[in-house]
Amino acid sequence: GLALSFFAKPDVSYYGGSKEQYISVCEPLQKADVAGTSYAAPWIARKLSYLIDILGLSREVAKALIIDSARGWKKKPTPEEVALYGHGIVPIKIEEVIQCEDDEIRFVVSDISEKWNSYNYNFPVPLQDDKYPYVARATMCYFPLCNRLQGVDYTNTELNIHFGRINNEGKLNEI
């Protein structure tokens, strides 16, 4: 449902069935056709369990992959759509969560942030005719400590990301 303008709640959406098209579930003794958002949560939990328990990913990386796969590159949802559906609908096939398209490169960076630390990661970034011939995006996910005294977002930690090239003086030329 609707939350603060800079939050997407829910993070993602999934099929929960409707009276027009039910989903099939396994009840204790038989198959049942049901509808409702509460039936979508186990499907997302199952995908997260696969990413964490089978592939060995951290919960942060698993959540980021789920959100990233729901958002996709071609979708540009309106703020109203994000407020109602989150970042998009998670793909049905787990392969679409863990693999990227042939024209994409996905970097997964995971680290532990300590107080007031800055980190630089070097990725091979092409420069052509003094321009960057690509589109970049980041899906960041973390589970911060929270405190009601921290203001509107309640978190004790904040993350920022900047893309660019480090020049000869060691400074970042942001894109």
PLM segments and residue spans:
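Active-site proximal loops enriched in glycine and acidic residues that flank catalytic Cys/His/Asp
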Residues: 14-16, 66, 140-142
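Secreted peptidase-domain scaffold signal
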Residues: 83-167
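Active-site-proximal alpha-helical segments within enzyme catalytic domains
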Residues: 40-50
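Catalytic-core environment of secreted peptidases
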Residues: 1-42, 57
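A glycine-rich phosphate-binding loop feature that marks nucleotide/adenosyl-phosphate handling sites
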Residues: 65-69, 80-89
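An often Trp-containing, charged/polar helix-loop segment at the C-terminal end
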Residues: 55-77
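Short loop/turn segments at secondary-structure transitions that flank enzyme active sites
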Residues: 18, 72, 144-146
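Noncatalytic accessory or regulatory domains flanking protease catalytic cores in secreted, cell-surface
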Residues: 170-175
